[in-house]
Amino acid sequence: MKVNTTRFGTLDVPEDQVITLMDGLLGFGESTRFTLIADEVGEPFKWMQCLDQPSLAFVVIDPAPVLSEYHFSVKKEQIKAIETDQVDDLQVYVVVTMAADILDVTVNLQGPIVVNKKNRLGVQLVLSDPKYNTRHALFTNQPENEVEFTEAIKQENRVASMRVAIAG
């Protein structure tokens, strides 16, 4: 499938790379088909590019590697539409709100996107747990939690060191 996007130009997306969100995303119910694109910054960031509305794309991450305390329960009826009741079949993503200052980057922990890895069907859940919100700080500046890591900066083929803390 060829899609002419506003952000990435023309994409040739194989059918096995299409994620179908059964009810779309909140506020974008008509947009149900997406694909994941690696971000130039690198992991853990990815772009969730809409195939139905080429100007629509969101930055997402798998929260597991960076937010180890993020756990929630799913009722079988919540994921019935994606045709699984096996936790191992599920991949979770959360939407990222990027900012100029890395300490202002947030993630929506209240609305995770849950995808069945086997058939690429997904749903966006709305969690009612008060400990999760739509603007959870992804990074903090608390020294006791600092983690040093390197990111390849593809534009210049060099490596930069970034010192951040994983919110915990």
Language-model regions: role of each:
Residues 69-74:
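Extended catalytic/binding region for NAD+/ADP-ribose chemistry, centered on the ART fold
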